[in-house]
Amino acid sequence: MAVPKKRTSKSKTNLRKTVWKKKALKQAIQAYFIASRASKKLNLEKAITKDLNTES
């Protein structure tokens, strides 16, 4: 089994964690906005079909 020869410094560990967390945060924000746009579009379509049904 592979074992590291030297201990990784705390600063390097924190740096890697920070990079990973920033990537995760960026993806979470992107997913939120995509879901938000999809929700708004769905609500708009429902409103339009509701208006069309009431006019008839």
Swiss-Prot record:
Keywords: Chloroplast, Plastid, Ribonucleoprotein, Ribosomal protein. The keyword Ribonucleoprotein applies. The keyword Iron does not apply. InterPro entries: Ribosomal_bL32, Ribosomal_zn-bd. GO terms for cellular component: chloroplast; large ribosomal subunit. It is found in: Plastid, Chloroplast. GO terms for biological process: translation. Pfam families: Ribosomal_L32p. GO terms for molecular function: structural constituent of ribosome. Its main location: plastid. Belongs to the bacterial ribosomal protein bL32 family. This is Large ribosomal subunit protein bL32c. The gene is rpl32.
